[in-house]
């Protein structure tokens, strides 16, 4: 059907044409090579990637979308066609497609096929920096990254294999928009036992990470144009998403006792929502005091407002037991509890959840149906097994011990080499450190210099909504595996600090 060199014709053909030919069986390996070109794949074949195959398929499609090589409305191969070309199980391709659908990048149109979504999430609307190869270690001092070297990959792979072997036709379907029932049951059981949160599986909604949880919440509570208390400083990426959803943020200061509820009331008593990280404030690491918890719940009950509890880093507490969830103290049912497995297991999981009050189950269910943020069933069922079989709690116990050790490595190195420039804040838990600047140099200048030198340091001031929040550096320690590595990082940071403040 092409004149001249077929490879040249395929190279210049629109992706939708190539996908259509592939679906009709009219092209073979050349067709897949063309698809690889469009997806900007690595030279190594799919089977050589260190990622699970479904994640590698997902990654390649995301990269092509982010770089603008696949656009809204472009057709993609059917699950069956792509599985045949790659010589892999249909369930593997289905898992990748479900993940892309749940995040809003694909639209499944039944017998009409699957296409790139007409309206892409904002993150995909402009080219993004190319991610490092999957074999690369996380950037030094990167925040929010669990210890990937300590994740039980063989165990996880075995659970995935077991799930695939017992997969039936129903399991390959799109699944419930609220999430796999087995995972919702497992989460409800875990929260009751370890976080003091009593709920039914019907109150649990599985989302695509914390961002997916916020998107569902904003839709269900109709937050566009509404005001929301937001911790200052607070999680910068959530702040961006909320603004994109049309939420008007009311900055509320954070001190040693957490969110200053009285300040929130003075600034906007009638705010519809408050978002808090009560167990381990992001990024300062303080816990919301009992007095402040009671005041926050009383305000929500009196005003008819809602509180979103982001249970951020609650499981990683190195001094004493994990603090009780705010939801466990919520007698008037005004708290929506949010959790995520990404920082406890691995970021690529993209698995978060919401526990909503019984009165909101129907409302959130309608929003879930409208948004169609379906997650990959295979991932959800594997995570359910991981929880139900006790692997999750054992993994957390191991990680607490490991993180306490690695935290000590980095603190010691910073105190040994950078004490003239930095003062490390004492924190009872979490997977990040905050080091306050002792010298009069803007933290964003230091952070930029550190980033250019390969250190993924964040400036504290970038996390604030109002000026005067202090100057400091935020850094992760979970992948600082040895004291020697910590010392090397401390010396590199010292050189940067000296250059910024000679």
Name each model-derived stretch.
Residues 233-236, 461-465:
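Short, polar loop motifs at secondary-structure junctions
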Residues 111, 328-363, 378:
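Active-site PLP attachment segment
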Residues 146, 278-282, 343:
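Short glycine-rich anion-binding loops that position phosphate/pyrophosphate groups of nucleotides
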Residues 160, 165, 170-304, 314-316, ...:
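Conserved core of the PLP fold type I
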Residues 2-163, 167, 172-173, 183-185, ...:
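N-terminal basic, amphipathic alpha-helical segments
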């Amino acid at each position: 059907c092409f004149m001249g060199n077929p490879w040249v014709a395929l190279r210049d053909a629109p992706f939708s044409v190539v996908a259509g030919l592939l679906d009709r069986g009219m092209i073979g390996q050349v067709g897949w090579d063309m698809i690889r070109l469009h997806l900007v794949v690595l030279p190594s074949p799919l089977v050589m990637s260190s990622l699970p195959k479904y994640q590698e398929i997902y990654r390649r499609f995301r990269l092509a979308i982010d770089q603008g090589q696949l656009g809204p409305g472009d057709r993609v191969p059917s699950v069956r066609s792509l599985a045949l070309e790659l010589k892999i199980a249909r369930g593997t391709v289905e898992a990748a497609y479900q993940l892309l659908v749940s995040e809003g990048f694909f639209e499944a149109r039944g017998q009409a096929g699957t296409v790139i979504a007409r309206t892409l999430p904002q993150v995909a609307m402009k080219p993004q920096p190319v991610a490092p190869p999957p074999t690369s270690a996380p950037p030094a001092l990167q925040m929010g990254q669990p210890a990937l070297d300590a994740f039980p990959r063989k165990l996880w792979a075995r659970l995935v294999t077991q799930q695939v072997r017992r997969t039936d036709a129903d399991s390959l379907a799109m699944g419930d928009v609220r999430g796999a029932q087995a995972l919702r049951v497992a989460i409800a059981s875990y929260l009751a036992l370890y976080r003091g949160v009593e709920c039914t599986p019907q109150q649990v909604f599985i989302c695509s990470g914390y961002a997916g949880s916020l998107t569902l919440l904003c839709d269900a509570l109709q937050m566009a144009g509404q005001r929301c208390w937001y911790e200052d400083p607070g999680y910068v990426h959530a702040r961006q998403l909320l603004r994109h959803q049309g939420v008007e943020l009311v900055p509320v200061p954070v001190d040693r006792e957490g969110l200053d509820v009285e300040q929130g009331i003075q600034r906007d008593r009638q705010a519809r929502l408050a978002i808090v990280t009560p167990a381990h404030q992001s990024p300062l690491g303080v816990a919301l005091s009992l007095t402040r918890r009671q005041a926050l719940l009383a305000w929500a009950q009196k005003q008819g407002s809602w509180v979103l509890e982001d249970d951020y880093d609650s499981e990683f507490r190195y001094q004493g037991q994990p603090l009780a969830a705010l939801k466990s103290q919520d007698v008037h049912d005004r708290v929506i509890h949010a959790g995520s497995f990404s920082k406890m297991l691995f970021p690529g999981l993209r698995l978060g959840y919401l526990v909503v009050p019984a009165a909101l189950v129907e409302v959130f269910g309608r929003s879930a149906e409208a948004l169609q943020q379906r997650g990959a069933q295979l991932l959800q069922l594997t995570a359910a097994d991981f929880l139900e079989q006790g692997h999750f709690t054992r993994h957390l116990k191991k990680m607490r011990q490991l993180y306490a050790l690695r935290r000590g490595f980095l603190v010691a190195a910073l105190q040994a080499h950078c004490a003239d420039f930095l003062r490390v804040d004492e924190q009872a838990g979490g997977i990040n450190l905050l080091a306050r600047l002792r010298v009069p140099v803007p933290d964003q200048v230091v952070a930029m210099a550190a980033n250019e030198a390969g250190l993924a340091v964040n400036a504290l001031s970038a996390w604030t909504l109002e000026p005067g929040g202090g100057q400091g550096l935020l850094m992760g320690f979970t992948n600082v595996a040895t004291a020697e590595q910590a010392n090397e990082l401390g010396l590199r940071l010292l050189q940067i600090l000296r250059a910024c403040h000679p």
